[in-house]
Amino acid sequence: MRALMAFIVVLSTCGSALAFDAFQATGIDRRAGATLPLDLAFQDESGRPTTLRQAGHGKPIVLAPVVHRCPNICGLTLAGLAQTAAGQKFVAGRDFTIVAFGIDPREGPADARQSLDKLRQSFPSLRHGILGFTGTERDIKSITDRLGYRYGWDDDLQQYAHIAAVAVLTPDGRLSRWLYGIAPDPVDLRLALTEAGNGKIGTWGDQLLLLCYHYDPQTGRYGSLIWTALRIGGAITVVAAGGLIGLAILRERRRLQRDAP
């Protein structure tokens, strides 16, 4: 995961001077459970004032920090997220909302609209399931600081360096999980939404499935507890079998030594 994130940071800062350290400026600090101010005022891509609370409609939010005019990875990140959303059972706009959260305070609704229009053409199912936010530097930082999401401005390239990741928020604005990379795994997104939904979305089957997985904050992925248990059990079995075989060989050698003339 660190290698992937490093690759993404390099894409965002390719050609920058040594004075700017993208690896020092960017990152995600672990702040699971942090509460976001849901009522800060932003603008959506149509120029209407809105808030994260209004965007969520009481459902989980998948928040993707982006630069709407980003020439590098942001378009790929949103396209990857859209593809991931289409590959799992929950429906954007019905079960959850995607917020393309602009981190550049110089951008406005027109920038968000331009980037989302292209996305909606490729993914018509997201037409009502994704919003593009822009806002003031103070309000943007209020959200990113609570999330522990760090990014930096490169004076030479005149653009932001940042990491490709999405934050999954609970309906009441708590940070539930981070999913890393340009295109999260659909199973990971489904599990993260189930967990963040607190029973408000999904079925009992989804809740039971969640019991079979655990979240690894190092990788931003969910792993199967059953598969992990099987691997541990298999390793224990191999060690135990090896010990029994070794003990049997030792006993046989001792018997042969006693029986020798």
Give a label for each model feature.
Residues 51-81, 98-99:
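Short active-site neighborhood of thiol/selenol oxidoreductases, capturing the structured segment around
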Residues 240-261:
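Juxtamembrane interface at the cytosolic side of transmembrane helices
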